[in-house]
């Protein structure tokens, strides 16, 4: 199953993805995103200056305003 990086504060999302069989890893830093098929972030760490390092080629989903179920659906859509 796909490896999904999820920010540690999104515990409900982590649990929902685990229930669906995904390999969930906490995103505590840039290194944690390496090798992930998809990442889920809160959006609070968005780089305002637009300068960032690309460490994953997979999709990144911003969780703000979405339920855990909606995020799971987005992950599944992106990984198709």
UniProtKB/Swiss-Prot annotation:
Pfam families: UPF0180 (PF03698)
Family recorded in the similarity comment: Belongs to the UPF0180 family.
Organism annotation: Geobacillus kaustophilus (strain HTA426)
Upper lineage: Bacteria, Bacillati, Bacillota, Bacilli, Bacillales
InterPro entries reported in the protein's UniProt record: UPF0180
NCBIfam families linked: PRK03094.1
Superkingdom of the organism of origin: Bacteria
Protein name: UPF0180 protein GK1051
């Amino acid at each position: 199953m796909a490896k999904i990086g999820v920010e540690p504060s999104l515990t409900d999302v982590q649990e929902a993805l685990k229930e669906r069989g995904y390999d969930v890893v906490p995103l505590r830093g840039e290194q944690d995103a390496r090798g992930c098929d998809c990442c889920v972030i809160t959006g609070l760490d968005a780089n305002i200056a637009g300068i960032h390092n690309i460490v994953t080629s997979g999709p990144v989903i911003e969780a703000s305003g979405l339920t855990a179920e909606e995020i799971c659906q987005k992950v599944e859509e992106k990984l198709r």
